[in-house]
């Protein structure tokens, strides 16, 4: 509903964000008749209506930063089935060159090196298993934490990969301090909404964004956590709340 209010003649594309690994409703965004760019930086390996992210939107962008579900030293990637977008991406990543030394747009040196590509190729077969473990941990959290904090919802048609498991509670700062006292790391991601930053300053009210920024806390969720680790984290949050 909010997206429909923003569509105008100047709209060139819609960017849907798969926040924390939860796939956005791409088909709903497609209904507006403008290209959809899917920000899948946090959802590598996720599914939407049984399809992998990367083959749903007009253009999909991935991050391979070291903390991501599929990671190397920090490069990124973009995939598309449209030749016109592919041509632009290839130019942008190579100083804007359409061919060698023929520069006809502003671009960057954004080519992935072979070493990082090799690392990603070797890690790719493990991605589904890693994501499965993240979902299993999320299931453990959900089973108990829903009585103490607001737990993350999974979008309809999305198969969440839990790049982050983010709880919501009005006392997240106190919870975070208590967890740290127990040797458990947590993090307040995006404590300042985009519309309140200097660059994107907007005087309008975005109540959902402001609520999430004020009350969200990410707790550990990765494939190397043991069941005992997860139980300890659950018990610490119960004690903190």
Where are these regions (language model features)?
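Conserved beta-strand and immediately adjacent loop positions that scaffold enzyme active sites
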Residues: 76-77, 164
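Active-site phosphate-binding strand-loop segment of PLP-dependent enzymes
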Residues: 1-72, 78-83, 218
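A conserved catalytic-core signature of glycosyltransferases
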Residues: 74-75, 115
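PLP-dependent aminotransferase class I/II
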Residues: 5, 13-17, 47, 84-241
């Amino acid at each position: 509903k909010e997206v429909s209010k923003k569509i105008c003649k100047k709209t060139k594309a819609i960017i849907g964000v798969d926040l924390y690994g939860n796939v956005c409703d791409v088909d709903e965004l497609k209904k507006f008749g403008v290209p959809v760019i899917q920000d899948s930086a946090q959802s590598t390996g996720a599914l939407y209506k049984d399809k992998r992210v990367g083959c749903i939107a007009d253009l999909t962008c991935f991050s391979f930063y070291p903390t991501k579900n599929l990671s190397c030293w920090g490069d990124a990637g973009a995939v598309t089935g449209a030749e016109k977008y592919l041509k632009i991406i290839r130019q942008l990543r190579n100083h804007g060159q359409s061919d060698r030394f023929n520069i006809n747009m502003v671009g960057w040196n954004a080519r992935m090196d072979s070493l990082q590509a090799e690392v990603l190729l070797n890690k790719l077969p493990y991605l589904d298993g890693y994501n499965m473990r993240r979902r299993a941990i999320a299931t453990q959290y959900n089973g108990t934490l829903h009585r103490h904090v607001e737990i993350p919802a999974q979008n309809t048609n999305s198969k969440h990969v839990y790049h982050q498991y983010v709880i919501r509670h009005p006392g997240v700062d106190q919870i975070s301090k208590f967890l740290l006292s127990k040797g458990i790391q947590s993090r307040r991601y995006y404590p300042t909404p985009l519309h309140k930053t200097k660059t994107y300053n907007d005087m309008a009210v975005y109540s959902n964004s402001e609520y999430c920024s004020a009350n969200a806390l990410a707790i550990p969720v990765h494939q190397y956590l043991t069941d005992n680790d997860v139980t300890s984290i659950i018990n610490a949050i119960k004690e903190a709340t």
